[in-house]
Amino acid sequence: MRNNNLTVHQSDERMFFLERLLLKTSFDVPTHVFAPNINVDVSVLADIEDGARVVLGKCTDEARALAESRDITLYNIMKDERFQAVNSRLTAEGALMLMIEHSVKSISDCNVLVLGFGRMGAAIAKLLNKLDISLDVATTSSLRPAYAFANHVLPMRDFDFSPYDIIINTVPLAVVNDSDLTTMQKGAVYIDLASKPAVNLEYARYLGADADIYPALPAKTCPYSAAKAMQEYISEVIK
C-alpha cells in the first residue's frame, strides 16, 4: 500500500508490520520495499517509476541492468552488516522455537549438529551454547571460532548423523548425500534454514526424519522484530 511516496510490497506478516512502522515517514521520491527473500525480476521492476528507490534483498542481473537504465536506485538490505547481524539473531531464536516444537525430547536432552558456521550458524551456536545444549558444528571455515561454542568441530563431508537428535542446516548447498542420510535417527528433527536445502528432504522424510525447510524464518516467528530491523535500515540509508 502507498503512503507518502512509499509502497511496501506485501508478501508476509513482517511486511504488514513494516508498513505500520513507516506510516508517518515521508519519502521525497517514490520508494518501494520488498521482503529480503523475494527475488525481484524484470517483470516486477517494469512497474516501478523511473527515478524511484527500491529496497530489496535479491534481484536478477536483468533487473539490475533495467534499474540502471531507468535511474532506479537499488538498496540491498542483505549487504548491510547491522541488518545481517540482527536477522541472524532472530533466525537463531526462530530455530530454537522449531527445536522445542518438533522434538519429543527436552532440548536439554538433545544432541544437536549445526551445519555451517557463517553468520547464521555462529548465531545459532552461540544461542544454544548459552542454553548449555550439547552441540557439534560441521564447517569448512576456520575451526577455532567454532570451538568456542561446540563440543566437536567436524568436516563438511562423510556425515554420521546417528548421534544427533536435531540437525540444523545453514549452508545453501546440497552438501549431504543420500547415503549420509541413512545414518540419521528415525524421528530425528532436521531444520533447514538455507535458501536451498542441503539434503534430499523427501528421502529424509521417507527414512523417518521430521525434515523441512524454513526460509525467511523471522518473518514467521517474530514478524514485528523482523520488520523493526528493516525499518531501522531504511531510516539509516534513506534520509
Residue positions per predicted region:
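Rossmann-like adenosine-cofactor binding region
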Residues: N37-G51, Y147-K220
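NAD(P)-binding Rossmann-fold cofactor-contacting core
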Residues: F27-D28, L131-F149
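Glycine/serine-rich phosphate-binding loop and adjoining beta1-alpha1 elements at the start
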Residues: F34-A35, N39-S108, Y233
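Glycine-rich adenosine-cofactor-binding loop
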Residues: N4-L22, S108-N129
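Rossmann-fold NAD(P)-binding glycine/threonine-rich loop
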Residues: K58-Y75, L193-I238
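Short, polar loop motifs at secondary-structure junctions
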Residues: D12-M15, N37-V40, K58-R64, A138-R144, ...
